Regions:
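A short alpha/beta connector and helix-capping loop motif
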Residues: 89-114
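Amphipathic alpha-helical packing elements
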Residues: 68-69, 77-97
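Active-site acidic/histidine proton-transfer and metal-coordination neighborhood
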Residues: 1-79
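Structured core elements
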Residues: 47, 81, 108-110
Length: 114
């Protein structure tokens, strides 16, 4: 039975960074280095998890939804992970699932029960 290897980064910066691309490029390179290591693709399913941009919490988020969805789309064998606790209160993961299925044959879910 395969296992999911979830890759994620911290929530973001509380200060206002001058360089918003550098951390993303380093994160992208780091994930690519991790995925370049040999592993059994039948037993390990790598995924990338986005972090929410919280109002008043971060100035910007390195591993945003745009970043992780784009990364997964460009890297065969890597799937996105949707965490139902990482969206704004007005967003519903259940509404996002059909949209994701249009582009990804599979993705991972992280469900938090409230």
């Amino acid at each position: 039975m395969p296992c999911v290897m979830n890759i994620w980064t911290g929530d973001g910066f509380k200060d206002v960074p001058a360089d918003r691309m550098g951390p993303r490029l380093r994160y992208k390179d780091s994930i690519e280095q991790i995925l370049s290591e040999p592993y059994d693709k039948n037993l390990v399913k790598p995924c990338v998890e986005s972090k929410v941009f919280g109002i008043g919490v971060e100035s910007y988020t390195v591993g945003s939804a745009e970043f992780t969805l784009s990364f997964a789309a460009m890297h065969d064998g890597c799937m996105p992970l949707m965490d139902n606790g990482h969206y704004h209160p007005q967003e519903y993961v259940s509404d996002k699932i059909p949209a994701m299925l249009c582009f990804y044959p599979e993705f991972a879910l992280h469900l938090s029960l409230i």
